[in-house]
Amino acid sequence: MRKQKMLFLCTQNSARSQMAEGFLRELAGDRFEAYSAGCEVGNEIHPYAVEVMNEVGIDISDQYPKGLRTYMGKMGFNYSIIVCARAERNCPKTFPGVCTRLVWIFEDPRGEDVPEEERLENCWRVRDQIELKIKNWLEHPEEELAKLKAERERERQERLRAARRARELRSELEEVPAPTRWPRPTAHHGVFVAPG
């Protein structure tokens, strides 16, 4: 059976998407080819991401940050999965060669407002969330696809409502009578005659 290709996307491809790539390769490498990329390209995989993955027996130290251009126009994917909110805003909504786009948002374990002493603990938590999400998806992909279908239908209905409202507003504007144009005042030049 031909393997399906899955691309995980985050902002810099330095933590969440790298962990997701490692988990998918480990859990279902016989069924999927796992890849990851970022909207931007980070300098390196975050050391904590490598550390917490090593703790569960998955070595991602050979992986490295890659940008979307690495794959654009060169490879098709069955799935692209956005794993962070910033990437959802900044990555293209459509990606050439992608059949299905999913959104699984995980918090940034190394966020700027997170104290250094909490970042490793956050990496553990996010790692476990990613593992659980991938395991659930592998066991019940139809549920995720049903949610996606329902979400797309909601978006379609919202677009239809917006288009209908725009038509109604145009129609209402056409029914409004044009403003009455008053004649322009004309200057009267009279001759003043002083009483005599």
Region locations from a protein language model:
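Conserved acidic residues
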Residues: 78
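Redox-cofactor binding/interface segments in oxidoreductases and associated redox assembly factors
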Residues: 82-83, 103
